[in-house]
Regions:
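Bacterial N-terminal signal peptides
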Residues: 13-25
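Cap/lid segment of the alpha/beta-hydrolase catalytic domain
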Residues: 494-612, 619
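Active-site-proximal cap/loop segments of hydrolase catalytic domains
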Residues: 559-569, 573-797
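Non-catalytic accessory segments flanking enzyme active sites
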Residues: 69-71, 276-281, 287, 441, ...
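Hydrophobic/aromatic beta-strand patches that form the interior of the parallel beta-sheet core
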Residues: 190, 278, 468, 481, ...
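Beta-propeller folds
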Residues: 27-466, 474-476, 483, 707, ...
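Glycine-rich His-Gly loop
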Residues: 282, 367, 472, 542-546, ...
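N-terminal secretory signal peptides that target proteins for export/translocation
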Residues: 1-11
């Protein structure tokens, strides 16, 4: 990934995970004896099936995995769907399946009326190369038909409809279009398709004016192949709108005051009568008065000033936008709210529109409200709202403002916003910063007099006599379970990963301790499957991320993280939460290093590890923390690895000219600009100026576009200093920041397992294709040993 602001924004006792762990352990207890099992591998991680949420995201975000799914019920409640996705390493494909369940059969099994465990039927299965889901945006059209987006062994995504009773899914859109969003109302289909990106104007001239351009757009002006685009990059790709009526496209041109309508991260909502479409469209020019709206987290680079070109630039994923109303017959496009949508100011709530039955009113989420003399200016300029828009009267009625904090200090985020058209109830689900659990739920009911009342009523829930949920814990991937009021225990209904019963998974538990400053630290501790408390094991620290409610396969991310496959090699793995209390402060680097030291100390004190055999990996923003550790505490780690990350280095600073907020970020983290007297501060704080101090073998992986350039300073300095450094470069530079394609994941994650196995356990895989790799590493070991000998001679003298 290029240095973007998203990369820079990150947000001793064991205990048994209570209810979920208990019943999952019972469910898995029928597996074969341990002697018949084999260790967990990177391939197992890649090919594990996950029950995913197929709803298209309307949030500008970077996701490490697809969110966990839940049953999607048919309108008549007789069936429900689950969607699974897994990687197929041999084909380098993602495979997704839509599974159909009979609810009566499920209910009878959970109640004990039937001994037959329900077996779902696959009504659609697609696989394809690429970095985006093979199936997404799944929804019932009625109780017999399902619509969804899918890729059929092609990088292009089409709109399909499948009947649940017969036949194969049939495509509604052409095979050579990439459909990015859709909505269907009766015989009207609205969908958007990607506009093929073109090289920037003038970027391929013999002489190029570089003023105001960043080095990445200059060096990489040609668009990526569609199979190499990931969800993050799609956020900056424009889409065109199409309308089908009775299967034929209407000859309508959709234009705004700035030209042809182009949509980004489209959210489409057709009125029940098929006449109107609501979406969120970018603005070509910032309207007067929008400067008053406050960007979230004070990201002033996104301030909606009329002279802020970045606020409306295509490459800005948070570009300024607003809700608009489209007449699908005439093509007229008009603003629906004279205020910005919240997502353009980094308010990460779902951006949706829900029509009421009269086709005159619609609920709009995550939008700011216009500011006038009679309104509460502070609330309207700092918090987006949920409103009801009357398209005939062009009026807005607020329902509520979306909250960002929960006293005393809990940070809230909106997980989902749901509308029950039959119950006329709106539900807003909040999660907190302490984990993925729901922190708060708000419900609002539409009364007959068109007013809104906050209520505790439920919305669109499964029948009370049967409760279904998708659950997982650290040691078990997602499964479908059910419970009825007459039974206290949950019943395992369906496990999409029976193959893992023949794999030794080992144990992952929560682990917490305090550092020397009294800060509470926490992480997830993965132990080798044959863990012996009398043995002190090597340790690998994986910083950045902590989710105790999700199956632990890799760790926080897929790029470079070894996770459970590392533990299977006899190495303790600590997935360590990165505290952000010192983020963008001059002592951030030293604070994070103290965290690493405290983890090593506590694990050694508790008898888990050998403090002399510890490795660490850095990814994305935590590469800076790893480099800070090996330059300022050179004896702390036996080996280190960094992948596609932020170095907070002099060279990265210069490369970031005219590229977002990166330089400002580095100046705050170091405490000065790297010029004049400020360079002295960089000399002491930036890792790149202190590589002469390191003795730790370092592996650098450069997988994304521009990473060879960004990481060259690290490699060049260490190489010049004759330090033990190795660097691998993905020549195509076609990987996303968070790896998705099975082949790329295997390359990155298996190299992590190999690297730490070599340095911490002296192990080499007996694979002829890795001969050159181990030859290089043995040479690095010689360099390290010579360096240690030289240091010893100096100390003795």
């Amino acid at each position: 990934m290029f240095l973007t602001s998203r990369k820079l924004v990150c947000y001793r006792s064991f205990f048994t995970l209570a209810t979920v762990a208990a019943y999952l352990s019972v469910a898995w207890a029928k597996a074969e004896p341990i002697n018949d099992k084999r260790p967990f591998t990177v391939q197992d991680s890649i090919e594990t099936s996950y029950i995913i949420d197929p709803v298209a995201s309307t949030i500008i975000e970077i996701r490490d995995t697809q969110p966990v799914g839940s049953p999607i019920f048919s309108p008549d409640r007789k069936h429900f769907l689950l969607i699974t996705q897994r990687g197929i390493l041999k084909e380098n494909h993602l495979e997704a399946t839509i599974w159909l369940f009979d609810q009566i059969a499920v209910s009878d099994y959970v109640r004990g009326k039937s001994p037959s465990q329900p077996v779902p039927r696959a009504i659609a299965r697609f696989s394809a190369p690429g970095n985006t889901p093979a199936i997404s945006n799944v929804r019932w059209l009625d109780s017999s038909q399902v619509a969804f987006l899918a890729k059929d062994r092609s990088p292009y995504q089409q709109l399909f409809i499948a009947r649940i009773d017969r036949g194969s899914p049939h495509a509604i859109t052409p095979h050579n279009e990439y459909v990015s969003a859709f909505d269907i109302s009766g015989n009207v289909v609205a969908y958007t398709s990607l506009i093929p990106p073109q090289p920037a104007k003038g970027s391929e001239d013999d002489i190029v004016d570089v003023t105001g351009k960043n080095i990445y757009t200059l060096l990489f002006s040609r668009p990526r192949a569609i199979e190499d685009v990931d969800e993050e990059q799609l956020q900056t790709y424009a889409s065109a709108l199409h309308i089908l009526r009775n299967g034929k496209e209407l000859p309508v041109t959709f234009r705004t005051g700035d030209g042809q309508l182009r949509l980004f991260i489209p959210t489409l909502s057709l009125s029940p009568d098929g006449r109107w479409l609501i979406t969120v469209a970018p603005v070509g020019k910032i309207p007067s008065g929008w400067e008053a709206y406050e960007p979230n987290s004070k990201w002033d680079v996104l301030r909606l000033r009329q002279d802020n070109a970045y606020a409306v630039a295509d490459e800005n994923p948070w570009k300024a936008s607003q809700y608009v109303l489209i007449d699908v017959q005439s093509g007229d496009v008009s603003p629906l709210v004279d205020a910005p949508a919240g997502r353009g100011l980094i308010f990460l709530a779902p951006t949706k529109a829900f029509w009421l039955e009269d086709s005159r009113r619609a609920i709009l989420t995550n939008t700011f409200l216009p500011v006038n003399k009679d309104s509460d200016q502070k609330e309207r300029t700092t918090s987006p709202a949920v409103v009801v828009a009357n398209i005939q009267e062009r009026t807005l009625r607020p329902i509520c403002f979306l909250q960002q904090t929960l006293p005393p200090s809990e940070r809230l985020s909106v997980e989902n916003i749901l509308w029950g058209p039959s119950s006329h109830q709106l539900t807003i689900v909040y999660t907190g910063n302490s984990g993925s659990k729901t922190a708060k739920i708000e419900r609002y009911a539409l009364r007959p007099d068109d007013s809104w009342e906050q209520t505790v009523s439920s919305i669109d829930e499964p029948p009370a006599e049967l409760s279904l949920s998708v659950e997982q814990d650290l040691d078990h991937p997602p499964v479908l379970v059910g419970r009825v009021p007459s039974h206290t225990e949950k019943v395992l209904i369906w496990d999409p990963n029976p193959q893992l019963k023949r794999v030794i998974l080992g144990k992952v538990t929560r682990y917490s301790w305090n550092d020397k400053f009294g800060n509470k630290r926490r992480g997830l501790l993965a132990l080798p499957p044959d863990y012996d408390p009398h043995i002190r094991y090597p340790l690998v620290i994986q910083p950045y991320g902590y989710d105790p409610d999700r199956f632990f396969a890799d760790g926080a991310f897929t790029t470079g993280y070894g996770g459970r496959a590392l533990a299977a090699k006899g190495i303790v793995v600590l997935q360590m939460e990165t505290l952000m209390t010192h983020y963008r402060l001059p002592d951030e680097g030293s604070f994070q290093v103290e965290g690493f030291k405290s983890a090593i100390h506590q694990l050694a004190e508790d008898g888990f590890i050998d403090r002399g055999h510890v490795g660490i990996l850095g990814f994305s923003y935590t590469c800076f923390h790893v480099l800070q550790a090996i330059t300022h505490q050179p004896d702390l780690f036996e080996a280190a690895l960094i992948t596609d990350g932020v170095n907070t280095s002099y060279m990265q600073y210069l490369l970031a000219t005219d590229h977002g907020v990166v330089q400002e970020q580095f100046e705050q983290t170091i405490g000065a600009k790297p010029f004049g007297r400020g360079l002295l501060q960089w000399y002491g704080s930036s890792p790149g100026f202190n590589f002469d101090m390191t003795r730790t073998p370092l592996l650098i992986s450069a997988l994304e576009r521009g990473q060879l350039l960004e990481q060259w300073e690290n490699y060049s300095c260490l190489r010049k200093l004759n330090k033990p450094v190795d660097m691998v470069w993905l020549r195509k530079e076609n990987a996303p920041h968070i790896l998705v394609q099975p082949a790329q994941r295997f390359l990155s994650q298996q190299m992590t397992v190999d690297w730490f196995g070599f340095w911490l356990k002296g192990f080499e895989e007996p694979d002829p294709e890795k001969t050159a790799q181990y030859r290089r590493w043995r040479e690095l070991r010689r360099l390290r040993d010579e360096g240690r000998s030289s240091a010893s001679i100096v100390l003795n003298n």
